[in-house]
Amino acid sequence: FINNNKQMKKNVIAIILARGGSKTIKNKNLKKINNKPLIGWTIDQCKRSKFISQIWLSSDSQSILNYGIKKKINIIKRPLKFATDKASSESAWMHAVKHLEEKKIKFDTIVAPQATSPIRGKSDFDDAIKVFFSKKYDSLFSCSVIKDFFVWKKIKKRLIPNYNYRNRKPRQLIDPLLLEN
């Protein structure tokens, strides 16, 4: 990405996390959606970006890593401790960053697309990268707006609403919630 104000070249890379041990949908990252593995959609979208210079795939699954090799992207073998149900995405990203630093891979900015959110427009990555640099943000994420819903959460066997139950607004007047994609 070239920032027109400073003529400074930015090295933007993508780190895609795709673990193999999903318990909900077995091998979900390799399940075909419209004749393409789920992970393939995100890889191809990153490849179409004008600004992403390198794509790195982090996984504990050799099958997923082999797919990355087939797609001609860089791979990082993720240790199992960063690939459990309880491991955070942040711990896996930090492992990937450490791997890149050890390999002396230079980058300024990381795009961290979710493989499980494959429905993106052709220019979504590039549009987001442009906004990120032009607004001088330190981070940026996409989200979906949830409107017209009463949301509850369960805390120690109690249900807690997202509204004041003594003054329940009509659903049309509820402030929208933002759900990170």
Segments from the language model and where they lie:
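Short internal beta-strands
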Residues: 55-59, 142-143
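Conserved core of the sugar-phosphate nucleotidyltransferase
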Residues: 91, 95, 109, 115-181
